Amino acid sequence: MYLNTLAPAEGAKHSAKRLGRGIGSGLGKTGGRGHKGQKSRTGGGVRRGFEGGQMPLYRRLPKFGFTSMKAAVTAEIRLNDLTKVENNVVTLESLKAANIITKDIQFAKVVLAGEVKGAVTVRGLRVTKGAKAAIEAAGGSVEE
């Protein structure tokens, strides 16, 4: 076997359809587009969801739900992020100073993810039960 003798398997490659190249090709004249109509024209076609003037499905169905704006100002804090804060006292301001959360965050909750290394004091943040147990097991404390 040589590189210059490599070839695809028989029947693995199909030649491209050459549209509009004579009636003998089977794809001459209209080129597989049929006769007249919007889809036969250059640039022709309808937008997504268009059903020919019938009320489309996405407008027949009712609207539902909403996007909570509270999610944009709330952050989850992992346990291993707590050690990145100076002075081992974790508050909303100290998290912002350590670039763990952005300045537009108004609420934060400490969740049980990762490991807490060393004693830290969490002040003024919401904390899950599991995270509270992990912080206290490491010698830290949670203040309201």
UniProtKB/Swiss-Prot annotation:
GO terms for cellular component: cytosolic large ribosomal subunit. Residues 21-31 have a biased composition (Gly residues). GO terms for biological process: translation. The keyword rRNA-binding applies. InterPro entries: Ribosomal_uL15, Ribosomal_uL15/eL18, Ribosomal_uL15/eL18_sf, Ribosomal_uL15_bac-type, Ribosomal_uL15_CS. Residues 1-53 are annotated as: Disordered. Coiled coil: none annotated. Pfam families: Ribosomal_L27A (PF00828). It comes from the Bacteria. Gene3D superfamilies: 3.100.10.10. The keyword Ribosomal protein applies. Keywords: Ribonucleoprotein, Ribosomal protein, RNA-binding, rRNA-binding. One of its GO terms (molecular function) is structural constituent of ribosome. PANTHER family: 50S RIBOSOMAL PROTEIN L15, LARGE RIBOSOMAL SUBUNIT PROTEIN UL15M. HAMAP family: Ribosomal_uL15. Part of the 50S ribosomal subunit. NCBIfam families: rplO_bact (TIGR01071). Binds to the 23S rRNA. Belongs to the universal ribosomal protein uL15 family. This is Large ribosomal subunit protein uL15. The lineage of its organism: Bacteria, Pseudomonadati, Pseudomonadota, Gammaproteobacteria, Pasteurellales. The gene is rplO.
